């Protein structure tokens, strides 16, 4: 199981160095989300669960602020809106295509906060709006654990906002019983501080590819000065190309090189065409 899972997660992590989502506009809802409803999952038909390992994947930020049918600006996704689902879909499908050959794949729709919320750089505002998103992720994970898992080992994975949700699950929702089944947690594109590592026992940094029950996390830039202010206190970083936590370079089959800059705990990627990965809408996040 280990080599097969690592093979696909290696490819997934490499892809997550660069992916992002697009812009939409549609209505929202403030009702409770019932995760026994198959419509609340990307794919709810789990009759073919024939893998020995599960993965619970939390999608990254894919929506922007939008105006609902009452003319009010909304900052959280309407998970039943078709257009918004279409914007979330590519990111979920990317993860599923990479990981479902080796894992039973579970990914809930949740009321994620908008990209506009992140662009505000207002951490208090972000935390306030994220509470609804996290409430949904908790409800989805509890339903998954009580109804789908059936005692199998599982992996937590999330990118960007999804990584934040994974980190919060590890801090507040994972019990000793659940932790016994946890293979690893992939929290890509977010931040974990030293204070958090010191305060929460299930926030354990991965040191190499053989660790279990740990967090695999990293952020990547092409220049050290491009690191987002939101990640300035991050302490967790492992290179997915060589599973090293030092500055040893890892070389991708795609031709680029990735090395950790120890002073900022961030991967610096060289040998790529920056224009292919530039996202104008998030320019404000850069210094």
Listing of model-derived features with the role each one plays in the protein:
Residues 158-162, 166:
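Gly/Ala-rich beta-loop-alpha elbow adjacent to hydrolase catalytic centers
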Residues 19-20:
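C-terminal motif of bacterial Sec signal peptides marking the signal peptidase cleavage site
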Residues 55-57, 105-109, 156, 184-187, ...:
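A structural signal for short, well-ordered beta-strand segments and their strand-loop junctions
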Residues 133-150, 171-287:
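Surface cap/lid and interfacial helix-loop subdomains adjacent to catalytic sites
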Residues 24-54:
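N-terminal module-boundary/linker segments of secreted carbohydrate-active enzymes
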Residues 58-152:
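Active-site catalytic motif of lipid deacylating hydrolases and related acyltransferases
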Residues 5-12:
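Sec-dependent signal peptide recognition
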Residues 51-53, 101-105, 150-153, 180-184:
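Loop/turn elements at helix/coil->beta-strand transitions in domains of secreted/extracellular proteins
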